[in-house]
């Protein structure tokens, strides 16, 4: 009975019985079996992939076979493979994904793909084609025009993120453009004149994008924040010191400037005083370092442009004698590399820039040439392009983000055609593309690597932005899609009142009065009758002085110091005693009564006789 009860209870509770020994497992054997299964499965997967690759290599014609025939072949192959696999152990786990089976002939399951959909293989093929032909990567399918002013746009600056553009020109204005905040009207959100009446020559954001370097025609560079408020201003040097290294700042007009690519507080400027100076934003009282370019004879030469290398180790300057001089940033005395005959002497080299790789240097000369140099072999240029007119001392040249193209602008005279933006292949230096910008010179150009957009400054006050909706990012794409904002007019609904104007006192016509009554009324009006002001009684008031003697104190003061002076004639006062002197002589007359009874007076002599009696040496010589 006990065994039957135990068995029934065990069956009810779902286990075999009570008090039996637990089952033991051999873990090593189970691990070995699992490993063998995984190895066999991986072998089968590799064999299947190799077979698919061999089939695809041997029979490329399978792409042209109809899908029905391919489906039949796949069915037969699947049946044969199923028979082969049936002999082996069954696969354990989820089924292999369809993209790993290599069966590209199966029909697509699901809704049809959109018309613009491209497979990843097609995109890779297009990318390879673009790499082979860099012209296809130029974003020039669309453009927007920003109206800076009417004079030349001589400076362009774009922050590293590509959110804000800043432009400067010969009209002394600096304008700020925010792509995210602009609408289709394309209006600048701020305009200012940071350097008063000096032309703006260079604008550049720092590598962090929080401050802007402003270089104008004066001798003091300025640093502004993102909103245009001043942060610092460089000190001016002493122009009476001969050695420019002993002055604290520039003493002549600035020509250019740029930020250090690695150190966010350091920037550089070059000037007509013959120096290239480095500065620190935190110290505006003195420069950080000074570099003095020299001519072949050791004389002072003016640097017209300057730049840092991409790693910030070298400083390059284009000089007015046609030379290009490169210094090590830590050694300011002697040049690291130099080329004396880079451009024609006496011309202004307008731009010096390094490639993104850092080993190629491009220069835009005032002799209408564009040259590339290898700084490791700095004797001769790699390539030269001539016939590129340059009328401005700040005409730009820059590399494309992939270092395959070099772009620059050309200058034209008024009415002489369109200014062009030229694209040159860096390897062959052949002109591969050009853009006709406008009927004015192309001065500034900038190709932003993140936005993949090209900014151009022209000689007629325009700043153009070229972009491609498919290849470009943000930037001009953000503002062209926004509709122009309408001016909001303040409208208020108020209750309408009808007012008769002649009911008001000011519009009411006066009644006709007689002439006598009108004259009497005017007589009572002190203004119309011109009544004089009455004398002031007592102390003065209202700016008028009161009469003297009005009070006891004023009467006493007036009589304290009386004027006792005799205002009579002195001759009459003397002659008053003449009769008494004749009758009763007392002082002088008794002395002459015996010796000279008759009075003898002096003879009156004329002026002419006096001049005649003068000696010769006293006479005036006429």
Curated annotation (Swiss-Prot):
Belongs to the WD repeat GAD-1 family. The keyword Repeat applies. WD repeats lie at residues 148-187, 195-236, 249-289, 298-337, 344-383, 389-434, 437-476. Pfam families: WD40. Residues 539-549 have a biased composition (Gly residues). The gene is wdr70. Residues 120-132, 604-614 have a biased composition (Acidic residues). Residues 37-141, 508-549, 602-622 are annotated as: Disordered. Keywords: Repeat, WD repeat. InterPro entries: G-protein_beta_WD-40_rep (IPR020472), WD40/YVTN_repeat-like_dom_sf (IPR015943), WD40_repeat_dom_sf (IPR036322), WD40_rpt (IPR001680), WD_repeat_GAD-1 (IPR051858). Residues 37-55, 508-533 have a biased composition (Basic and acidic residues). This is WD repeat-containing protein 70. The keyword Repeat applies. Residues 67-84 have a biased composition (Low complexity). It comes from Xenopus tropicalis (Western clawed frog).
